[in-house]
A protein has these predicted regions:
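Canonical Radical SAM [4Fe-4S] cluster-binding loop centered on the CxxxCxxC motif
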Residues: 2-30, 258
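Auxiliary Fe-S-binding modules of radical SAM enzymes
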Residues: 159-166, 176-312
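A short acidic, helix-capping loop that chelates divalent metal ions and anchors anionic groups
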Residues: 18-23, 109-116, 180-184, 265-267
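Radical SAM/AdoMet-radical enzyme domain recognition
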Residues: 27-50, 54-172
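Residue-level recognition of short loop/turn positions
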Residues: 8, 52, 251-252
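Residues that scaffold the ATP/ADP-binding catalytic core of kinase and kinase-like folds
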Residues: 8, 12, 58, 111, ...
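Glycine-centered loop/turn positions within well-structured domains
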Residues: 7, 110-111, 238, 264
Length: 312
């Protein structure tokens, strides 16, 4: 719902958010988002994830969530957030009706976290997670991008293991993905998630069979732990096999794949309430172009200049 982010993570926006001067379109208006959700819900979509950038920087963020929950047939509304104001907004997030919250925390080491994000906010974010748990919110996930020589050591893995032993949180490592403008960073820091998979196998974690509606994470459980571990490995052979996702950019472009080479604007069909049937027809017509796989392993990153553009 926005490309704006207040963090400066090295793998995404190392210099912070800078507006794209070649594209002067504004971000989707709340009414356009409502019409979009209505069309998708009538096509059978049951879950919407709000991403960015950082979605909570939008002044109408909570209003967007409430509209999706109360004025559409979408069953689950979830967000991915950096948690910058999590300690201050935890109750507001719950009261808005959100069904799930994914928080990006690349390290439990305060200095490492600061070096990656350029913000010293780890204590406040962890406090926010505790507040959410104290208020009874249970659908919490934490994502970390796996970075060679930064947060991919046994010490890092043990720290997260200790964390989820006491906290009912799903923690997932995401393999660093190459985008259009991070090739040097990718070459320096990419490491296969197999290193974490080996750690899990060596420490008694058991692979959990996925349901039909599951996401891309390979999940592992241990009866001695409250939380779960997960791996998101976009370079693995069967990563795209069960893909059930479509993406809409903050400016109204439909993307069939995070790393696809094509995208079309559907914004012209979000201007009036009576355009729903046209919108649905256009979306269904595009589905036949959804490919079986991305081509990341060949270095083809498609239209994704950085992940804030497509909601990675």
């Amino acid at each position: 719902i926005t490309e704006v982010c207040n963090f400066k993570c090295g793998y995404c926006l190392p210099n912070g958010y800078m507006a794209d001067k070649s594209d002067n379109r504004k971000f989707l208006h709340i009414d356009e988002i409502r019409r979009l959700a209505k069309g998708f819900s009538e096509l059978g979509v049951q879950k919407i994830r709000l991403t960015g950038g950082e979605p909570t920087v939008r002044k109408d963020f909570f209003e967007i969530v409430k509209i999706l929950k109360n004025e559409t047939s979408i069953k689950k509304v979830v967000i991915t957030t950096n948690g910058y104001h999590l300690d201050q907004k935890a109750k507001l997030l719950i009261d808005s009706g959100l069904d799930g919250i994914n928080i990006s925390i690349d390290s439990l080491d305060r200095e490492t976290f600061k070096n990656i994000t350029k913000h010293d906010r780890l204590p406040e974010i962890l406090k926010g997670i505790q507040i959410l748990q104290d208020l009874g919110f249970v659908n919490l996930k934490i994502n970390a991008v796996l970075l060679n020589g930064v947060n991919a050591s046994t010490k890092d893995f043990n720290a997260w293991s200790d964390f989820i032993k006491k906290n009912k949180v799903n923690f997932r490592y995401i393999e660093l993905m190459q985008t259009g403008d991070n090739l040097d960073y990718f070459n320096r820091y990419h490491i296969s998630s197999k290193i974490f998979k080996s750690y899990l196998n060596d420490n008694g974690w058991i692979y959990q069979t996925q349901g039909l509606d599951a996401g891309p994470s390979l999940n592992y459980i241990n009866p001695d732990y409250k939380g779960k571990f997960g791996i998101i490995a976009p370079y693995s052979k069967d990563f795209c096999k069960s893909c059930n996702r479509l993406r809409i950019t903050s400016k109204g472009d439909l993307r069939l794949c995070l790393f696809g080479n094509t995208g079309i604007s559907i914004r012209h069909l979000l201007q009036k309430d009576d355009q729903t049937e046209e919108l649905k027809d256009l979306i269904l017509g595009q589905m036949r172009f959804k490919k079986e796989s991305h081509y990341l392993e060949l270095g083809e990153t498609g239209l994704t200049k950085n992940l804030s553009k497509t909601g990675g």
